Amino acid sequence: MTKYLLAVSGGVDSMVLLDMVATNYHGFRGKYLSGAQFPADFIVAHYDHGIRGKVSAEDAEFVRQQCRNYGVAVRCGYGKLAAATGEAVARQYRYDFFRRVAEAIARDDPVYLATAHHQDDLLETIALNIVRGTGWRGLAPMNQPRVLRPLLDIAKAELVSYAIEHGLAWREDQTNDSPRYLRNRLRALLASRSPSNKAELIRLYERQKHLRRQIERELEHYCARHIARDKQGQLVLRRYDLIMLPSQVAIELLRYVTDGYLTSPQLQQLLLFAKVGRPGKQMLWKRVGVRLDTKLLYCRLSDLAIYK
């Protein structure tokens, strides 16, 4: 039986998601969540980073109380991150917690994470990726397997209107207004743009999403022909193929083999290693291990996560 993990921070977006799931708003569960039963098939997950001290603890208690009101189980995680912790690090801790909860409840059942990312979040992420010099994948973000984003077509203003109309309570995160974070500065910039500008970004996203699906489908076909799995469960591919392929194609192949766990610089490093590394040498990351012999590259994934 499929289980669903709802990421709920206590903010307006996630409280709307929780309410839509609980009330099956306009057939919401049937449309996005395979008709799952509430609350039996759901667990709420909340992570308190500890960044905002007492306020963070109050957010966690708020989420627990709301879950009691809805009659749904909740798992809370706690961190002790410094106030100066960056968004990327905080996100990693949060998703590591979601992964641990998913593994704890999975048994033999698939578990999907549902988040409250909305259209404004999507636009901000695309803009952020462009500013950081993204590759083509950064123009079609939010595409992880087993992560559902049912609110992605809805603007933030519509979610706020829903919350007010349905009398929902929520918590405000004051750090969302801080100019210290690049995402917040880009949010203010995007807010000043015309609807037509935003529509162009959405159209760019849709085109890139379609292209991404085509590329990944071709990768799957290539890998089915050229990659094997040995008795130890390691993925095996020929070093010769990586040497002969164009570099960007080889990088995409390695990204596929390593299940998206490595960053672009790490993939560049791995490609060089595959081309010139000596037999018997290894490279190890948190969830990826690679070993070379004379002709082959062996890749083992450990601590398999469903979220990246």
Language-model-detected regions and their locations in the chain:
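AMP-forming adenylation/ATP pyrophosphatase catalytic core
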Residues: 1-13, 25, 43, 47, ...
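Hydrophobic residues within well-ordered, non-membrane alpha-helices that form the packing/core
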Residues: 21, 67, 102, 194, ...
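Phosphate/oxyanion-binding loops and surfaces in catalytic or ligand/nucleic-acid-binding neighborhoods
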Residues: 129, 133-137, 193-196, 207, ...
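Residue-level recognition of alpha-helical structural elements
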Residues: 86, 197-200, 215
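Residues that cap or delimit alpha-helices
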Residues: 155, 194, 244-247
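Core alpha/beta nucleotide-donor-binding catalytic domains of modification enzymes
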Residues: 1-189
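Amphipathic alpha-helical interaction segments
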Residues: 181, 185, 203, 252-253
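Conserved anion/nucleotide-ligand pocket segment
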Residues: 187-204
